[in-house]
């Protein structure tokens, strides 16, 4: 009895040393990091509440998808909660945190806006290091955008260049370089990182859907996955196409569950009374606004 207790105590005491020496995080450590009382998560709730909510939704998507392909759900949940901590450096520059004070990007040129958006990766890695978060979380922070293009500001820059060319013949700015508007990477290199990479894009896009239905969600995810695959974002990841398909189906199910209150159901006159129909329509408009 005493030997068993001592052995257990020794194992628990040795875990931090093992994790530090081999740069691995056990499920026990990762599970502890899902506690919302972690200083970084508490800070995010106050300084970047939109990002905090986004991270919770990404965690739900990633955890369920991990279960569907035999990846580590605890790792996915923990890493998802911290993947966007770098946004706390300049929270107002990210859509989910912008309120009545407007969009600060309106005062920036596209290249500067892209630089600010991309900087949340570097800021996040630094915060993770300062708070001694496991190496795997730092990997996810670094990889969760891969080398994707910050499309909005790239297209904005191209449009401005085109307008200058039409107006002045000789534009006073260089033609936009696509590499300036791409994240530095690396691309996702392990299954859990790739799952969070997709979950991050899916949650942000689904939040903006004007109408929520099985068809609209499925079409949205199909476009996101197709775009990322054609862009070569999974070239360094061991995920198979079969696993990618399972992840996509898991995302569809989880997204529909998360957005359930916004789903517009077809009206069946035989089942719905006029008052019920009016109530459902009003609720759906209120939720979507």
Predicted regions: what is each one?
Residues 41-214, 218, 223, 227-231:
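Divalent metal-dependent catalytic cores for phosphoryl transfer on phosphate-bearing substrates
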Residues 272-274:
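Cytosol/matrix-facing juxtamembrane amphipathic
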Residues 1-6, 131, 251-263:
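C-terminal domain-closing interface element
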Residues 1-49:
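Generic detector of multi-pass transmembrane helix bundles and their immediately adjacent loops
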Residues 276-289:
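Long, low-complexity, intrinsically disordered segments
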Residues 265, 269-270:
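C-terminal amphipathic alpha-helical interaction region
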Residues 231-256:
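Cytosolic regulatory/linker segments at or just downstream of nucleotide-handling modules
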Residues 69, 231-235, 260-264:
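Active-site phosphate-binding and catalytic loops of NTP-dependent enzymes
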């Amino acid at each position: 009895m005493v030997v068993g207790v001592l052995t257990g105590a020794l194992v628990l005491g040795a875990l931090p040393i093992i994790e530090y020496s081999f740069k691995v995080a056990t499920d026990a450590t990762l599970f502890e990091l899902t506690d919302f009382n972690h200083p970084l998560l508490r800070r995010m709730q106050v300084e970047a509440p939109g990002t905090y909510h986004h991270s919770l939704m990404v965690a739900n998507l990633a955890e369920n998808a991990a279960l569907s392909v035999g990846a580590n759900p605890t790792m996915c949940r923990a890493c998802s909660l911290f993947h966007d901590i770098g946004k706390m450096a300049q929270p107002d520059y990210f859509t989910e945190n912008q309120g009545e004070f407007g969009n600060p990007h309106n005062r920036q040129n596209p290249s500067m806006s892209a630089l600010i958006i991309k900087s949340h990766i570097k800021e996040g890695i630094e915060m993770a290091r300062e708070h001694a978060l496991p190496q795997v979380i730092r990997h996810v922070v670094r990889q969760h955008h891969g080398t994707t293009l910050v499309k909005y500001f790239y297209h904005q820059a191209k449009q401005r260049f085109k307008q200058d060319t039409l107006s002045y013949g000789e534009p006073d700015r260089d033609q936009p370089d696509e590499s300036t508007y791409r994240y530095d990477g690396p691309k996702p290199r392990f299954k859990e990182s790739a799952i969070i990479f997709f979950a991050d894009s899916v949650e942000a896009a689904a939040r903006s859907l004007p109408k929520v239905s099985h068809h609209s969600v499925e079409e949205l995810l199909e476009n996101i996955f197709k775009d990322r695959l054609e862009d070569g974002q999974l070239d360094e990841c061991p995920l198979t196409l079969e696993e990618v398909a399972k992840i996509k189906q898991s995302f569809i199910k989880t997204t529909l569950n998360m957005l359930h209150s916004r789903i517009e159901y077809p009206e069946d006159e035989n089942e719905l009374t006029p008052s019920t129909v009016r109530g459902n329509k009003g609720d759906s408009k209120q939720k979507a606004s």
